[in-house]
Amino acid sequence: MRHVLPIIVLLLAAPGCHRGVRFENQVLTKSGVSYRVGEVSPGWERVMLSSNDLAWFIEDTGHALQVNATCKGHDDPPLDVLVRHLLMGFTERQLVEEQKVVVDERDALRSHYRAKLDGVPVELLLLVVKKDNCVYDFSYVAPLGRFEERVADFEALVHGFHAERTS
């Protein structure tokens, strides 16, 4: 399981760039955008992936969190299309629950799935929101049966989200 779950983090990665990215006081700043996220609890290891703005991983359990903003080249697709993009690479996808929610005063789509990656069962919680010409996506991946253990950290990240600026 340990060798498969880091792949999950990589597959969830939406296009991004770490050059010129700064994360201080829960605010991520990169070219053209700055946004705030909530704080995750102790135990998460922040990992630097060139394809994500922010990512955390718990090696002992295989839980993963990811946040990314895309402000160029996304052609303004609907929220459900953005969720499907995040599901690429996963097979046997089963939608558990999907709901429209409001995040930072914008409509967002929150989707809970069970799926497999390379035959390994996982649970996913995905959230996409569009604001000020940017797409923000949040992902939580948990081993099947361990979803509830760390879902509060995903909720904290999203609850603390605020788009600070775009240019």
Predicted region positions:
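Sec-dependent signal peptide hydrophobic core
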Residues: L5-V9
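Bacterial signal peptide processing site
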Residues: H18-G20
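Surface-exposed amphipathic alpha-helical segments
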Residues: Y35-E45, F90, Y136-S167
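Positively charged n-region of N-terminal signal peptides that target proteins for export
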Residues: M1-H3
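Short aromatic-glycine motifs in intrinsically disordered, low-complexity regions
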Residues: N25-V37
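Conserved polar/disulfide-associated segments of primarily extracytoplasmic proteins
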Residues: R46-D137, A142
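A general boundary/transition motif marking the beginning of the first structured unit of a protein
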Residues: G32, T70-H74, G145, E149
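C-terminal motif of bacterial Sec signal peptides marking the signal peptidase cleavage site
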Residues: A14-G16
